């Protein structure tokens, strides 16, 4: 008898992670006795970005590992690690089966990433506080005059400016040929009414409801940024 996979998936729209859908569908803890409860909870939290203010600024355990392995954190821009992030992820698939987070964080390839992450954390925080400007519900982080953009988890801007429900990162494109506006909604205050993908599409970019980017000519950057600010403020 053919199982009704599609109906189960459709009824799991509110599942916190894709992994949880698969885990539950195939029998949960009985089918996967080696998968710990805390690891599944960590996967749910990461996939749905349900991090607290403190977990963003002071990550530990599974939360820290998530930030380390997220390419958007940017650690790879500053060091040639012994193994690539991709290879480490492949290795961790095997290692996570039989080890807890305490053991995982002691692995040499993980330790070197932890050291670099916290080395950058203070600098990244200071940089964000210096380069950010608040426009009502929006915080704009303009990094175009920064020689070095320090590594940080992608949610730090929301923890530093909790009064804002959406952000724009202004950065140079490749070789400063154009300007990039990367826009995303806060995970701490999910009240933003802007459809980010649709807004970015108006300026040749794209994305989805909660995040998106557009690239514009440098001589149009300030005009476009002003328009983005006005629309986002109007949306609330």
Which residue ranges define each predicted feature?
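Internal, active-site/partner-interface "lid" segment
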Residues: 30-76
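Short glycine/serine- and small hydrophobic-enriched flexible loop segments
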Residues: 20-28
């Amino acid at each position: 008898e053919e199982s009704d996979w599609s109906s189960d998936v459709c009824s799991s729209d509110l599942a916190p992670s894709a992994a949880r859908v698969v885990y539950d569908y195939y029998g949960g803890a009985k089918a996967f006795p080696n998968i710990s409860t805390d690891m599944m909870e960590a996967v749910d939290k990461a996939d749905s970005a349900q991090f607290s203010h403190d977990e963003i600024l002071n990550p530990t355990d599974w939360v820290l590992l998530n930030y380390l392995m997220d390419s958007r954190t940017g650690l790879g821009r500053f060091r040639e690690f012994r193994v690539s992030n991709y290879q480490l992820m492949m290795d961790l698939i095997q290692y996570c089966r039989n080890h807890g987070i305490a053991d995982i964080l002691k692995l040499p390839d993980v330790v070197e990433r932890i050291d670099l992450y916290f080395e950058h954390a203070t600098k990244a925080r200071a940089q964000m506080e210096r380069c950010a400007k608040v426009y009502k519900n929006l915080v704009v982080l303009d990094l175009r005059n920064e020689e070095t953009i320090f590594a940080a988890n992608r949610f730090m801007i929301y923890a530093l400016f909790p009064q804002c429900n959406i952000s724009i990162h202004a950065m140079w494109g490749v070789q400063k040929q154009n300007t990039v506006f990367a826009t995303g909604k806060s995970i701490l205050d999910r009240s933003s009414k802007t459809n980010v993908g649709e807004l970015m599409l108006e300026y040749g970019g794209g994305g989805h409801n909660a995040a998106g980017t557009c690239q514009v000519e440098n001589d149009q950057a300030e005009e476009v940024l002003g328009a983005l600010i006005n629309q986002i403020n109007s949306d609330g």
